Amino acid sequence: MLSKFKRNKHQQHLAQLPKLSQSVDDVEFFYAPADFRETLLEKIASATHRICIIALYLEQDEGGSAILRAVYEAKRQRPELDVRILVDWHRAQRGRIGAAASNTNADWYCRMAQENPGVDVPVYGVPVNTREALGVLHFKGFIIDDSVLYSGASLNDVYLHQLDKYRYDRYHLVRNARMADVMFEWVDQHLVHGRGINRLDDPQRPKSPEIKNDIRLFRQELRDAMFHFQGDADNEQLAVTPLVGLGKSSLLNKTIFHLMPCTEHKLTICTPYFNLPAVLVRNIIQLLRDGKKVEIIVGDKTANDFFIPEDQPFKIIGALPYLYEINLRRFLSRLQYYVNTDQLVVRLWKDEDNSYHLKGMWVDDEWMLLTGNNLNPRAWRLDLENAILIHDPRQELAASRDRELDLIRTHTTVVNHYRDLQSIADYPVKVRKLIRRLRRIRIDRLISRIL
């Protein structure tokens, strides 16, 4: 059992985090991607002093175009608006995985700038590492005036449910001038004015190899770049703490690590890709041994954005959902005893051809973590991540919180036994062969660390 001293150490970490007081009326939950899209467009259209959009990517498709056009229109109507868009440097300059890079998002940003002379909408490319595989901009948030619209979603057709398919995420609007200022000022100082940052809407931008040294130094600087602010809330009231982190020892990682053992009754985790860092798996096992309940909601392998149906040409990236399922099966086989006693509940999300991208953590009725962090080794070590930790000691958000979780569970089925999941022998031939080949040369372990 967790000693009192150890539990106090975890609780002490949370108690010492600076917290900003939050009015319950200024926290809004959205439960569907189309609501998120409409809210984002409304906020952009009504902005009075700033629009700062941060996402992994802003895609050149119907959904992404609607957002970028709305930002241009807002700037045209109100030239005094402080407008900036930040996306990952590498992702913007390639096609989708497996597609040619002939007409990239960066090319589109340049065209939009040329088509709108006199309307300055800078699109900054943030290079978190020298190669995309080794780290991306996974910082999330849409800072508009005194509000932060927060979601793990990027901006394209499926995330915004622009057409028939959607990718399910979490969506929250937090109106809090202090938090919006803290996040905006950090982005301005460390990203917009960081070394190695260049505008993607400029066709004369440098090539990645030309800024390689700047990127390396920038990454080092990001490791130490935290949000600095004075808290104004105590531990007995509704409060928010914005967090940012890059690298294994970041404050964000430490907070996630300390948050889990503070569970008195139940921990709920959402992640789209079941590939938890070992340190978090150990936390879960300790909670189960201490008699606590743990619920994990993950996407079915067919609801993974990398899943390729058997009737389509197979690409290597299509093996990923199977690798995640292998991880989950192995995890459950170790902990089947707790599944049998209903202490551990694992749910698989699947809704027709739609995909699942939810991430986050709920500890009892007291703590909620809003984050884009996938709780995997990549998020733990390689990507620039952030989060908003909500402390709700008086359960003022209980109704919205319960509704959100009930809706997340709607399209899920409970895994009653690890054998309910397919084993490698059940996989399509091409997947089976590839996984066995990867295992022979032990590269599956490397893959699990970077994907």
PLM feature spans:
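Short, glycine-rich nucleotide/cofactor-binding loops
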Residues: 57-62, 270-278
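Short beta-strand/turn micro-motifs composed of small residues
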Residues: 55, 87, 271, 298
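Short, solvent-exposed amphipathic alpha-helical segments in soluble enzyme
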Residues: 188-189, 283-286
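Long, C-terminal catalytic modules of enzymes
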Residues: 338-451
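Short catalytic-loop micro-motif centered on adjacent basic/acidic residues
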Residues: 52-53, 267-271, 347
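Short, catalytically relevant binding-site loops at active-site mouths
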Residues: 274-276, 301-304, 376
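HKD-type phospholipase D/PLD-like phosphodiesterase module
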Residues: 10, 15-45, 61-263, 302-359, ...
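Residues at the starts of beta-strands that form the adenosine-phosphate
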Residues: 50, 82-84, 266, 289-295
